[in-house]
Amino acid sequence: STLFPYTTLFRSAVFAKEQQLELVPNEYFITPESKERFEKAKSMDKHGTVGCVALDMNGNLAAGTSTGGMMLKKYGRVGDSPIIGAGTYANNQTCAVSCTGHGEYFIRNAVAFHVHALMLYKKLTLRQSLQFVVDSVLTPQNGTGGLIAVDKKGNVAWYFNTAGMFRASMDSNGIKKIEMYSK
């Protein structure tokens, strides 16, 4: 057991020794299969995020974001996905938001939280809030990415400043919408 439920890779070997965990050489983790996956990902320069937002029948909003990660990233890097307010945010007063893109910009600007704040304090619609954050905060800093969201009334919206963003939605009547490029 530990007092620190959250750590990064920084000093992970020291932490593992303190916890009396078995240590193995780093080469242990390099298999022909993992090396092939790494080389393939490296050549494609692609990564993907899976995000979801939901409104249940009781009016509760939820958001989740699972990152595909950035290959060849600096060790110990923590992206925006696990940081509430940066890459993921939900508040029953307004909306649920999940983000994808260059995480450092989302962290520095608390992007997901600001969608909520714009709706709460400025009374912007969900779509207006998404558009404002992307166009007025991310884009001027050369930050790229997109957001999906649902508001407390069940309105679904998304906005992005990239060539495309895969997304899908389904309403309470089972009507599905799947899109890739158009905003």
Regions found by a protein language model. Give the residues of each.
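Short beta-strand scaffold segments in enzyme catalytic cores
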Residues: V50-L55, L61-A63, G145-V150, V156-W158, ...
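Short beta->alpha transition motifs characteristic of CBS
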Residues: T65-G69, Y159-G164
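Conserved mixed alpha/beta catalytic, RNA-binding, or beta-rich assembly cores of soluble enzyme
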Residues: T67-R108, H116-K122
